[in-house]
Structures are given as structure tokens and as C-alpha cells.
């Protein structure tokens, strides 16, 4: 799992950081909702265990499909080599890309929570990247504030 620190996931976020973030928030929410928070946390840590740079590996690894469609299966295979997984954890890892993988519909509530946390983590990474790259320049700082104002209809 620590090898995930070597691979970038979204923008400046490593795969490891992304998975820890997803696992933490899924654990917290599942515990609040009295669901299987242990399975959610374990699967959250393992849901992106694919160990390759997805931006330039399609030809090198001879992948037949796009990364978004194939990495859940690769992550499940890698996670199964490390530890035994229960059915909830398997479902979470395989179906965390829903609705992109439209026919891979999540079976458990914990799977939906991981799916949502995964998308929120990606949005947070995008926001952090945008904020750090744009808001360091004075002109863009005001443009960013204006854009946020438009999005949330403050003006």
C-alpha cells in the first residue's frame, strides 16, 4: 500500500493520500450511520491499489480498456494478494467507479459511500490545484473569487 505514494492520482495528490482521505471520510460517515465502517475503511484504503501511472501506461501495459474501466479489477486482484476480503470490501473495490462504470451498480450502502467519497476527494484535489495555481497571482485571485461568487450565486 505504501508504494501508492509513488503514483500521482489527481493533480498534485498521490494515490496513497487520496485513498487515506477516502478511507477516513468513509469510516467517519459509516460509523455515524451504523454501517460496517471497518470494511469501508479497509476497502477505502485499497480501492485504487493499481500501482502504475495511469496517465501514460495504456500502451506500455497493453491495457485493452481505459483506466477508469479497468483499474477496479486490477485493484481487487492486488488487494486480494495482500489480504482476505469480505464481500462488502470486494463490492466496494469493484464498483467504486460507478456511475462511470454504469453497469457495475453498487450492492451495499458502504459501496455508495465510498463512491461518493471518491468523487468528493477528486473534486477537493481539483479545487486545491486550482486554488494553488490560480490564487497565487493577484489578478487571478480576484477572478477566482468572482468565479466562486458566480457558482454559489453570491453576487
Model-derived regions: residue spans:
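Metal-dependent phosphohydrolase cores
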Residues: 1-155
Amino acid at each position: 500500500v505504501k508504494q501508492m505514494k509513488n503514483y500521482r492520482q489527481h493533480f498534485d495528490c498521490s494515490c496513497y493520500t487520496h485513498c487515506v482521505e477516502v478511507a477516513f471520510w468513509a469510516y467517519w460517515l459509516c460509523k455515524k450511520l451504523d454501517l460496517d465502517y471497518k470494511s469501508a475503511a479497509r476497502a477505502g484504503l485499497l480501492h485504487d491499489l493499481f500501482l502504475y501511472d495511469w496517465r501514460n501506461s495504456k500502451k506500455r501495459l497493453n491495457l485493452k480498456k481505459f483506466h477508469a474501466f479497468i483499474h477496479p479489477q486490477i485493484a481487487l486482484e492486488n488487494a486480494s494478494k495482500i489480504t482476505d476480503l469480505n464481500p462488502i470490501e470486494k463490492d466496494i473495490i469493484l464498483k467504486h467507479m460507478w456511475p462511470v462504470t454504469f453497469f457495475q451498480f453498487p450492492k451495499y450502502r458502504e459501496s455508495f459511500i465510498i463512491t461518493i467519497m471518491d468523487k468528493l476527494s477528486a473534486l477537493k484535489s481539483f479545487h486545491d490545484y486550482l486554488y494553488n495555481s490560480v490564487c497565487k497571482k493577484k489578478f487571478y485571485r480576484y477572478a477566482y473569487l468572482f468565479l466562486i461568487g458566480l457558482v454559489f450565486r453570491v453576487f
